[in-house]
Amino acid sequence: MRQRTLANGLQVVSLATNGGTVSVQVWYRVGGKDDPAGRSGFAHLFEHLMFKRTKHMPDEMFDRLTEDVGGQNNAFTAQDMTVYQDEVPSNHLERILWAEAERMVHLQVDQASFESERKVVVEELRERVLADPYGRLFNALPELCFERHPYKRPVIGSEADLNAATLDDVRRFHATYYRPDNAVLIVVGDFDPAQLDGWIDRYFGPVKAPAGPIPRVTEREPARTQDARQE
């Protein structure tokens, strides 16, 4: 396994293997706990928006770059991270690296795309949580377990908060958290290490890290001295 850090702060972890395929993941240090006040579920909503148009790619281009060549892509949001995953034949690795750098920098979400994807996420909330007794249970547990820490908010959020989100929120969130010094690029598979380094330097190297600090959650959870119950 090899590790290095670019001048802009991007951490790179790679492991060369055999087999003709390669897996690329980009981990961003932002998740549900970082949702803006009154915008629970926003990190997860933003994950969906990252598959939309960029300056040089049309909507859903990641499906074309992965599924059309026999690969796949996916993403997930947790409390502490948002992760984007791509698996493709090795000869398509360079395109995926370019595309991941492209959406890190040049995401362009318009109002129509934003509204469309918000409806998808709200429907996901209704189906997986509100319409499912177990979904409601697991959604309620964090609020019962935590008093102050943002972990108390469910990653999927609430319908009211999702509907309150705006396009300006999207732009601020992208500029604040989707930056090279807040990300880890992981590449595992069949590739030449020297060639991989060259591609990463070419596509991610020019990405500038903003001068301002990355906001971090500093709220401390008080010690629990008794059981938490909800009837």
Name each region found by the language model:
Residues 112-116, 132-140, 187, 191, ...:
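Non-catalytic accessory/assembly modules
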